[in-house]
Amino acid sequence: MINKQLLKKRFNNHAKTYDAYADVQKSMAHQLINQLSTNFFNQEIAILEIGCGTGYLTQLLCKKFPKAAITAVDLSSGMIELAKKKVTEDRVSLICGDIEELSIERQYDLIISNATFQWFNSLHTTIKKLYKQLKPAGSLLFSTFGNGTFQELHSCYSHAKQKLGLFSNSSPGQSFFSLEELSQICEQALVPLREHPFKLSKMEKLEVQYFPTVQAFFTSIKKIGASNSNEESYCQRPSFFRQLINLYENNHRDENGVKVTYHCLMFNITKTNQ
């Protein structure tokens, strides 16, 4: 389970450093924009953005849809305050809240979310809730992280536990779904809604970053507020982390630096007119 209060606190604390370290998230935002249909670009459509953060994707949406009314939601008040400084158009409403708890009153032509669905505790329920708020021919478009994310870290964490004889079920962070697992969750959520047929498309991509040191990688995670917000425990022994860092440096460093893999998933669910 994600501890939402802890998550909110971390995003609030690191809102001001988020943009400087969120390179992969920015890349994913552009990939989302590139997936959008050109049909709506000059129309007065309604858009709901979930997890707007500091407003990076919100700005891209404003440029792509000059006539759209945009509602952007984020859990963190610190993120919302920064987004308000970037996005000042009257047609954009910025709201602080948890989309899993908020009541959605209106319907939207587009519901879009970048690198946020991994923070949901009730993914099945939330996908169904959002899909119901789509207008006919509307789309739910989202990106999130897959189970190949931080594969180097997870491998070294497991090996470090073995070397030190630790047999706990702890992990260095939350677990992510594979493309197929998340696809099944979407279908299980939506198939019962027979009165609202859907079309689902999906894709995955690996993004690789390099850091000068393992510590620099850990710092980048902290600076975007995305350090472990699970309620599960993880090993914090100094001897364990020395072992972990040594394994990472020895096994995942090349001429470019320390390698970090992000597994990016993208889903587009369209409410068909059938």
Swiss-Prot record:
This is Malonyl-[acyl-carrier protein] O-methyltransferase. It comes from Priestia megaterium (strain DSM 319 / IMG 1521) (Bacillus megaterium). SUPFAM superfamilies: S-adenosyl-L-methionine-dependent methyltransferases (SSF53335). Pathway: Cofactor biosynthesis; biotin biosynthesis. Converts the free carboxyl group of a malonyl-thioester to its methyl ester by transfer of a methyl group from S-adenosyl-L-methionine (SAM). It allows to synthesize pimeloyl-ACP via the fatty acid synthetic pathway. The lineage of its organism: Bacteria, Bacillati, Bacillota, Bacilli, Bacillales. It is an enzyme of class 2 (transferase). One of its GO terms (molecular function) is carboxyl-O-methyltransferase activity. HAMAP family: BioC. Belongs to the methyltransferase superfamily. Its EC number is 2.1.1.197. One of its GO terms (biological process) is biotin biosynthetic process. Transmembrane segments: none annotated. It catalyses: malonyl-[ACP] + S-adenosyl-L-methionine = malonyl-[ACP] methyl ester + S-adenosyl-L-homocysteine. Keywords: Biotin biosynthesis, Methyltransferase, S-adenosyl-L-methionine, Transferase.
